[in-house]
Amino acid sequence: MTLFLLKHLLKNIFLRTMNIIAQTARLLIRELTPEDERLLLDLDADARLTRYVKKRTEQESKKVFKDTLRDYQKKTGMGRWGIFNLADNDFVGVCILDYSEFDRNSIELGYRLHLKYWGSGIATELAQAIVSYGLNEIGLKEICAVTHPENKASQKVLFKAGFQPHGRAFWHGDDLPFFKVSRSTF
């Protein structure tokens, strides 16, 4: 067996054991493991990253993490995943593709990245990969997203990932821009 084939085989075995959702040029998106809990807790504790979303207590974050691990057993193809830098395995953030909290009939994309990755194109790369995964791999008809009205950077990411404005959504008392992307327009 050549060295190339051996490396390819080992990489595929590694990816399957890590429950990889998607891989891009710079990112590895995978299911979280029990050892990743501190990563999510630290992300949720950073006030700079929760400026546009509801802040969680540490106990709430621990419950979200526990529920996330439990939900993987459902094998729906959806969930909350860790985002890791492919070059050095640095934790970039989290993303979610799951039933929306504001409309249980919709599947929503969400993401939160560490500050050092803002402005690098990582969010767009991530959003495009997850939209492609949702529409092409698990066969969703459409995916929605909401942003805080002042979060113009996230709105730009959504446009670059193929989303279009689709009215407003009301969530936790906030009136939010609502976006959708469908298989027919992606």
Language-model segments: which ranges?
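A short helix-loop-beta-strand connector motif used in the catalytic cores of GNAT acetyltransferases and
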Residues: 69-82
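Conserved GNAT-fold acetyl-CoA-binding loop/helix
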Residues: 48-68
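A generic local structural motif
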Residues: 15-16, 67-69
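Acyl-donor (CoA/ACP) binding surface of acyl/acetyltransferases
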Residues: 3-51, 80, 84-186
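Short, conserved alpha-helical segments within structured domains
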Residues: 56-60, 79, 150
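Hydrophobic residues in alpha-helical segments
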Residues: 44, 53, 72-74
